[in-house]
Amino acid sequence: IRDRLRSTNSLWASYKIIEGLTIKETISYDFIDNQSTTYWPMNSNNGEAYNGLMIKYPYQHHNIYSSTVLNYTNTFADKHNLDVLLGWDVDDRKEQFVQAVGANYPHDKLPELGNTSEPMTASSGYSEDHLLSLLSRINYDYDDKYYISANYRRDGSSRLGAVSYTHL
């Protein structure tokens, strides 16, 4: 038996602050709930040696992403074009699971872990990580002939330790 639910949602809004300056916010949420149960009956190839065998594996995943971007564009004296972007992204992820295995069931009609006389293994796990990014870009051109561009991005990740994330 496998029940799986996945929900992916995204929402964005943009607002013109003044002429040439806009802000855009994007928020996304991804959720997975997976409930997996496998039972091999007593007379099956996999279950015969264990007098019935069951594995349960519930798993959940949460991911929240947010992006905020300020963008400024302007043309000066009909020949100087400027485009400046400043933004930051936040990405938070959490996952958790439990796995339990049981064997030696009294009857095939009672395939629940609480009915086993021989719990074999149980394990669980939890992970969480965060990513924070700062980004910027400046584009300039003169009369659509001469271009210059500069970009900067800095990422801080909890996967690389507290110093990487907090000293962004």
Language-model regions, residue ranges each:
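Extended hydrophobic secondary-structure segments that form protein cores and membrane-embedded regions
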Residues: 83-89
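Solvent-exposed loop/turn segments connecting transmembrane beta-strands
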Residues: 158-163
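Catalytic core regions of nucleotide second-messenger enzymes
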Residues: 79
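Surface-exposed loop/turn segments flanking beta-strands in extracellular/periplasmic regions
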Residues: 1, 37-54, 94-122
